[in-house]
Amino acid sequence: MLKTLKQKIIDSGGFVNAHAHFDRSYTSDSFTAKEKKLHLHEKWKLNDRYKNSASVSCYENNIERSILSQINFGVTSACTFIDIDDITQSAAYIAASSMKQKYKEFFDLKIACQTIKGVLNKQQRYILEMWI
C-alpha cells in the first residue's frame, strides 16, 4: 500500500519539503557527541562557530548534498531557510542561489531567509534587507 501511495505521489509531481535548512545540513558532523546534546541556544553558538569558517563553497557542498538526497527520496521541490546575518553575510544565500540555478531542471528550490539573529538590531536588519 505504501509503495502504491509513494508511486502515486511521484507520478503526480513528487514530494515537497516545505521546511528545510539546507545551508546547515551536515554541519553537526563537525560537532562532538557531547556538543550534539547541548541545549538549542548553545547549539546556536556551535552554528556560529561553523558559520565563521564556512565559505560559499562549503555551503554549496552542504546544499548540493541535501538536494541530491531529497531527489533520491522522490522530493521534487523544497523551501530552504537560509541564514543571513552578520557572520554568514551573503555566503549561504549565494550558495543556495547557485544550487537553485544548477538543479533548476530537476528540483524546484525556493529560498527563504532565516532571521535567527532577529531584525531589531540595526546591523542584522541591514544585512537582511540587502539580500531580500
Tell what function each PLM region has.
Residues 25-59:
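Active-site gating loops and adjacent loop-to-helix segments of metal-dependent hydrolytic enzymes
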Residues 1-13:
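Histidine-rich, glycine-flanked metal-binding segment
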Residues 51-132:
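Active-site loop-helix segments enriched in His/Asp/Glu that coordinate
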Residues 13-25:
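Histidine-centered catalytic micro-motifs
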Residues 19-21, 39-41, 103:
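Histidine (H) residue identity feature
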Residues 16-19, 47, 78, 90:
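Generic intrinsically disordered, low-complexity segments enriched for polar/acidic and small residues
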